Amino acid sequence: MPRSAVVERRTKETEVKVELSLEPGEVNVDTPVKFLNHMVETLIFYMGASGRVKAIDLRGFDDHHVVEDVAIVLGSTLDKALGDRTGLARFGWAIIPMDDALTLASVDLGGRVYFMFKGSFTRETVGDMATEMVPHFIRSLASSLRATIHVNVMWGENNHHIAESVFKALGLAIGQAIQVKGGGVPSLKGVL
């Protein structure tokens, strides 16, 4: 099974295209939000995946539409690449330090959508991205990926380090969950 997918989404606000392979390789992210580029590149790299993400902002209001739509399309692309999810590990978790910041992330790819984020930032932005968009990105990703995602920022002082520890931990957790373990459906019910 190829474990790759391409998804495009066009709205009156953005155009987003994501090409994703669940094999390691080159990652290229090009959006008008530079800090988002850094975070999405980090996420895909730590998932052990490769791909290209291209987003165009058609309205230019702020970072909200681009961040949200990239998360939606990335989640949809990953969902498509996973197929029927037979044989997946399904669960993944990581606790990642980034200097002063420490973040726990846990993922369940069982098809039930839920999102929980515990943590806070002391600045309104990191670079050109609003810090409120960090949890919103993850919420949007969880919804389109059909996943349960919990993120707990245990502590941190530097806002860049906090955000980066979130995306690294989430990437590693998703990377574990997408591993093929063999066998059937990863559920006692027999279906996801």
Swiss-Prot record:
Q: Which domain of life is it from?
A: Archaea
Q: In which pathway does it act?
A: Amino-acid biosynthesis; L-histidine biosynthesis; L-histidine from 5-phospho-alpha-D-ribose 1-diphosphate: step 6/9
User: What GO molecular function terms would the record report?
Assistant: imidazoleglycerol-phosphate dehydratase activity
Q: Give me the Gene Ontology terms describing cellular component.
A: cytoplasm
**Can the keyword Lyase be found in this entry's annotation?**
yes
Q: Which UniProt keywords apply?
A: Amino-acid biosynthesis, Cytoplasm, Histidine biosynthesis, Lyase
Enzyme superclass (EC): lyase
Does Ubl conjugation show up as a keyword for this record? Answer: no
The catalytic activity, as recorded, is: D-erythro-1-(imidazol-4-yl)glycerol 3-phosphate = 3-(imidazol-4-yl)-2-oxopropyl phosphate + H2O
Q: Which GO terms describe its biological process?
A: L-histidine biosynthetic process
| PROSITE patterns in the record | IGP_DEHYDRATASE_2
Q: What is its EC number?
A: 4.2.1.19
Entry's Gene3D superfamilies?
Imidazole glycerol phosphate dehydratase, domain 1
Task: Fetch the CDD domains from UniProt.
Answer: IGPD (cd07914)
Q: Which family does it belong to?
A: Belongs to the imidazoleglycerol-phosphate dehydratase family.
- Record PANTHER family: IMIDAZOLEGLYCEROL-PHOSPHATE DEHYDRATASE (PTHR23133:SF2), IMIDAZOLEGLYCEROL-PHOSPHATE DEHYDRATASE HIS7 (PTHR23133)
> Know the name of this protein?
Imidazoleglycerol-phosphate dehydratase
Which species? Answer: Caldivirga maquilingensis (strain ATCC 700844 / DSM 13496 / JCM 10307 / IC-167)
* Gene name of the encoded protein: hisB
